[in-house]
């Protein structure tokens, strides 16, 4: 009796296995299902400066661009006076350094202008202008943000420096080697958690944004240098100098300080 029950309950009759349920491959066949995110495609820019075939500004020089030069890094004889883009590997490294330093300079120029704008808007900030900040930071108890000593308990500039080293080291480590933020595809433009706004979804807009980033970053690096020189000479921030110049363009300009070799006076 037990043997008969076993025979009935087993999924094989007369030595042939009976299929209880079809496999997944039989149900779906050989079709492939792919899912992708639908992103609205933005039209490529009509700007002559940021498109792929950008106008070369150095028309008088030799117009034949080198093979390594893209639209963003014109390597004509006049553009790369120091021959920094002579070797392709060096050009790639220089482009990486330019993008990283340009992003930093864009943030720095925004911060220098924003601090001056906040001071102009009568928000009482205890921090000095961009010019005098380095001297004030080394003094003890100088890093009281927004004039409230209880807001940030980091009165030591060395403690702030150590925290910055740890935090930026961790972020840069994830950017280069991957980690909990996702795998690394391109270390210079990591994407994923590093791109919360999704600016790199559309490849055409992304290529145009890369060019704009490098061009605006070069402008920001040069303008930050100008802010420093202005602050050393005049002792004022960039917005104060702009307001003074607009108030009296004839007297308040660079020539008024060109004969003044004592900084800050």
Curated annotation (Swiss-Prot):
Domain of life assignment: Eukaryota
Amino acids binding chlorophyll a 4: 216
Positions bound to chlorophyll a 6: 245, 254
Positions annotated to bind chlorophyll a 5: 212, 230
UniProt keyword annotations, A-Z: Chlorophyll, Chloroplast, Chromophore, Magnesium, Membrane, Metal-binding, Phosphoprotein, Photosynthesis, Photosystem I, Photosystem II, Plastid, Thylakoid, Transit peptide, Transmembrane, Transmembrane helix
SUPFAM superfamilies in the cross-refs: Chlorophyll a-b binding protein (SSF103511)
Cofactor note: Binds at least 14 chlorophylls (8 Chl-a and 6 Chl-b) and carotenoids such as lutein and neoxanthin.
Sequence positions that bind chlorophyll b 4: 164, 175
Binding site for chlorophyll b 2: 152, 181
Cellular compartments annotated: Plastid, Chloroplast thylakoid membrane
Extent of the transit peptide: 1-34
Transmembrane segments: 151-171, 219-239
Bilayer disposition of the protein: Multi-pass membrane protein
Pfam families named in the record: Chloroa_b-bind
Residues that, per the record, bind chlorophyll b 5: 164, 261
Job of this protein: The light-harvesting complex (LHC) functions as a light receptor, it captures and delivers excitation energy to photosystems with which it is closely associated.
Quaternary context: The LHC complex consists of chlorophyll a-b binding proteins.
Protein name (Swiss-Prot/TrEMBL): Chlorophyll a-b binding protein 1C, chloroplastic
Organism: Solanum lycopersicum
Gene label: CAB1C
């Amino acid at each position: 009796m037990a043997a008969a029950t076993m025979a009935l309950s087993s999924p094989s009759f007369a030595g042939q296995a009976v299929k209880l349920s079809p496999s997944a491959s039989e149900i779906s066949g050989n079709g492939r299902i792919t899912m992708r995110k639908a992103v609205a495609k933005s039209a490529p820019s009509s700007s002559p400066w940021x498109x792929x075939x950008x106008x070369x500004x150095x028309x008088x020089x030799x117009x034949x661009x080198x093979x390594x030069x893209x639209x963003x890094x014109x390597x004509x004889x006049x553009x790369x006076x120091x021959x920094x883009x002579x070797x392709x590997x060096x050009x790639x490294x220089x482009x990486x350094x330019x993008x990283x330093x340009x992003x930093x300079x864009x943030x720095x120029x925004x911060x220098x202008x924003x601090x001056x704008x906040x001071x102009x808007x009568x928000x009482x900030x205890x921090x000095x202008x961009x010019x005098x900040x380095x001297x004030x930071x080394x003094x003890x108890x100088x890093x009281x943000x927004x004039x409230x000593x209880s807001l940030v308990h980091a009165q030591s500039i060395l403690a702030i420096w150590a925290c910055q080293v740890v935090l930026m080291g961790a972020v840069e480590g994830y950017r280069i080697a991957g980690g909990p933020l996702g795998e690394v595809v391109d270390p210079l433009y990591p994407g994923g958690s590093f791109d919360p706004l999704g600016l790199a979804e559309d490849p055409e807009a992304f290529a145009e944004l890369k060019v704009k980033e490098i061009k605006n970053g070069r402008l920001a690096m040069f303008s930050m240098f100008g802010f420093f020189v202005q602050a050393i000479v005049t002792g004022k921030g960039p917005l104060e100098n702009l307001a003074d110049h607009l108030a009296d363009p004839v007297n308040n300009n660079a020539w008024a300080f060109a004969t003044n070799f004592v900084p800050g006076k």
